[in-house]
């Protein structure tokens, strides 16, 4: 779990947040006379919680806490949790290659079913309000204790065919998706082409266009359940509108080059342009005539992302004694821009505090753009060591990340803090320092159990426990990347 501590204008507002996940999966491959059938059955569990130290969240227009002047917001909204269990069944049939004339075909067909069983719980009653200058409560809202659940069925069918003629391959395909929450029937085109210029795999060009549907529909449904436990004591009503939401999707255009350099070096360059459409966003407004706070979900969100990747690796590993060494170096750059707002938090409260200071300007909370998650430049060095006699593999990744921007909350001691706006929460876009991390993985496939395909793996992420913080020391809030993390994995194929 992690913990957020209060800031100068949000006293007594500490909270703890935590999450966990685990799951099981079973894969079965069946070789038929004319095709290969793969079946997967799985289950995974994901849960998270937010536990505030207090059950009352209120804003004072004239703060009575300590020596704070002007507005301050105090307290919390109690204990809220949510979880989802996903039950998965997947099957895919890969046909053996066959030839019609001078053209070969290798089609495949697949189907998937995922049932998501989710619940959310408010463990205790909490409330929020505003104390105006006269000392009276306004915008008083009670969040009742409750527990609710939501089940969503997701169905998928897909098919594609790899068509090859001489040194050119095409792969047209199509995918159908449906879920019973938004009840949208979505059809996605898929296409990929590959040209082996000299028909010897030394120089290759690839290009493709794909559409992918999906979005965080489940979280929106759980939010709606929690909103149903909300009661306005002040007489204000709440209303949520969905307006026949569409399913968010991404259009992706990709191009790639592969060139063999000398006898044993392969260079690859890839570019991907991804455009997100119909992303779900929300906005809130108050109808003064009916005293109704209206939250509208819509498909106004959109994002454009450019990804570049350049890599060098060996076609055949280096052999030293009984150890195979596979080095690889990867340069990547990602630039993304979108219009989704900051207002996508875990939970809302009706304190009337709907304006913030963003980069020195007083603006509506809904109008603040999403934080810039660009990764300007990343360089990764991968080095794998394989000892064939024992079945041991030691994989390592050393990654350098260029300095990038992040969004922080300003404290009063920060030079960028504007005292004129001391009544409001203040955000600023700052720079994160460059970082260097090392991830390692040790896996063992016992040779005496080779037929059982047993593999035991241990991962250590961020071995050096590197801490990457906001490079402004007097913000009052420090943001760090994940610390050292351990994983243990045991798998068996039969």
Model-derived segments and their meaning:
Residues 31-36, 96-106, 167, 197-204, ...:
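Short loop/turn motifs that connect adjacent beta-strands in outer-membrane beta-barrel proteins
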Residues 198-248, 273-295, 461, 466-473:
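Surface-exposed extracellular loop regions of Gram-negative outer-membrane beta-barrel proteins
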Residues 5-182, 307-317, 321-330:
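Face-selective signature of the C-terminal outer-membrane beta-barrel domain
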Residues 20-26, 85-91, 153-159, 187-191, ...:
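Hydrophobic, lipid-facing positions within transmembrane beta-strands of outer-membrane proteins
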Residues 2-14, 51-79, 125-145, 221-241, ...:
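Solvent-exposed loop segments that connect transmembrane elements
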Residues 39-45, 109-115, 172-176, 193, ...:
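Transmembrane beta-barrel strands of outer-membrane/channel proteins
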Residues 390-391, 399-418, 433-437, 443-494:
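C-terminal beta-signal and adjacent terminal beta-strands/loops
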Residues 164-169, 271-281, 287-410:
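Gram-negative outer-membrane beta-barrel transporters
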């Amino acid at each position: 779990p992690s913990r957020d501590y209060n800031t100068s204008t949000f006293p007594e507002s500490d909270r703890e947040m935590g999450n966990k996940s685990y799951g099981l999966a079973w894969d079965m491959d069946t070789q038929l006379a004319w095709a290969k059938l793969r079946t997967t059955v799985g289950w995974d569990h994901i849960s998270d919680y937010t536990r505030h130290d207090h059950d009352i969240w209120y804003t004072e227009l004239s703060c009575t806490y300590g020596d704070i002047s002007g507005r301050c917001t105090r307290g919390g909204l109690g204990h809220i949790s949510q979880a989802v269990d996903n039950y998965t069944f997947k099957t895919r049939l890969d046909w053996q290659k066959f030839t019609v004339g001078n053209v070969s075909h290798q089609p495949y067909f697949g189907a998937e079913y995922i049932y998501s069983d989710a619940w959310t719980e408010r463990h205790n009653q909490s409330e929020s309000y505003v104390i105006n200058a006269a000392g009276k409560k306004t915008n008083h809202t009670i969040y009742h204790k409750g527990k609710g659940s939501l089940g969503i069925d997701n169905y998928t069918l897909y098919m594609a065919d790899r068509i090859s003629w001489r040194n050119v391959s095409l792969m047209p395909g199509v995918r159908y998706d449906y879920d019973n929450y938004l009840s949208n029937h979505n059809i996605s085109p898929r296409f990929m082409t590959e040209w082996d210029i000299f028909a010897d795999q030394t120089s290759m060009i690839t290009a493709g266009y794909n559409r992918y549907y999906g979005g965080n529909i489940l979280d929106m449904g759980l939010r709606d359940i929690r909103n149903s436990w909300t009661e306005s004591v002040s007489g204000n009503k709440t209303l949520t509108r969905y307006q026949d939401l569409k399913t968010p999707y991404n259009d992706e255009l990709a191009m790639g080059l592969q060139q063999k350099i000398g006898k044993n070096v392969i260079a690859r360059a890839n570019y991907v342009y991804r455009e997100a459409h119909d992303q779900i966003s929300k906005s809130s407004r108050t109808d003064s005539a009916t005293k109704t706070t209206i939250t509208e979900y819509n498909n106004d969100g959109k994002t454009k992302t450019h990804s570049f990747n350049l890599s060098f690796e060996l076609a055949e590993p280096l052999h030293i004694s009984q150890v195979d060494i596979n080095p690889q170096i990867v340069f990547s750059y990602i630039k993304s821009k979108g219009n989704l707002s900051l207002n996508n938090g875990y939970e809302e409260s009706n304190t009337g505090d709907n304006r913030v200071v963003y980069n020195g300007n007083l603006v509506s909370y809904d109008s603040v753009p999403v934080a810039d998650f660009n990764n300007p430049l990343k360089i990764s060095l991968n080095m794998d060591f394989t000892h064939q006699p024992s079945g041991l593999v030691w994989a390592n990744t050393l990654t350098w990340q260029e300095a990038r921007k992040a969004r922080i909350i300003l404290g009063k001691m920060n030079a960028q803090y504007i005292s004129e706006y001391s009544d409001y929460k203040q955000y600023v876009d700052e720079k994160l320092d460059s970082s260097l991390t090392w991830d390692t993985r040790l896996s063992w496939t016992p040779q005496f159990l080779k037929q059982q395909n047993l593999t035991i793996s241990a991962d250590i992420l961020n071995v050096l426990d590197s801490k990457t913080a906001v490079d402004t020391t007097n913000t009052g809030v420090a943001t760090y990347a994940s610390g050292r993390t351990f994983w243990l994995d045991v798998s068996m194929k039969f």
